[in-house]
Amino acid sequence: MKNTTILILLVWVAHLSVNATDNLRIPDLRTLSLGSGGVTETPLYNPALLALRTQNRFYANYYNRYSVSELATVSGGFYYRNKVIPAGIEITSFGYDEYRESLFRFSMGKQIAEKWALGVAFQYALLQSELFEESSGRISADIGIVYRPVENVSTGLSILHFPSVQTGDKNIDNRHIASYSVLFGFNWDIINTVLITGTLENSEEETVTGSFGMEYRPFDEFKIRTGIRTAPLRPSLGAGYRIAGFDVDIGMVYHAVLGVSMGIGIAFSF
């Protein structure tokens, strides 16, 4: 009975998630706390950001929706900084044994001018469930650009999952694991201790989705974050601490009907 209930809830959550962020494209906890915009914050939403990284980075995240372990997303990856073409590898898993979504992603970025960077990514998303006799997947691509008119301002534009090609069982509707969307956003370091970020998104399900976030840095090692996202309205809150090359981030998102989702992330930069 529990498995049946969880499967029904999974289908419902998948439906709710189509409009903006699919179950597999969960950003790092910093970005999630800032409203989950991401187009100027994480290479997962904009591969061009790889070109602006100054260090290599390993990371791992755990995000639990609504305190239900079967709705957890686990992700990890590595961003490699080099002078030729910075690259990244990301792996994500959502669900549990009876229902599993997986993502394997490779991305590249390149600074093409003093103020411009361009990036592309290729990913394979896989859906496996006891409800289906066969698995189903999608191969898709992302493209993104970043423009920095001045040192403390960045703007970004990315197109996610375009194009997208279905593999495996064609009778399974798996569009939610590779939902097409276009994002445009900015971040602005107003002063040394405050950063604001905002994103507008157009997707297959929602004409416009918006997010806004703010990060306050009372100390170099400690950061407090808050954000909000529309469709539906979801406020978020989080914090981060850095020590000896390690970043530890926590975050939570509140949904008026389904409750609180929480997560933790750890990264090492060198």
Question: Which residue ranges define each predicted feature?
Answer:
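Cleavable N-terminal export/targeting peptides
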Residues: 1-29, 269
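Subset of outer-membrane beta-barrel
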Residues: 21-270
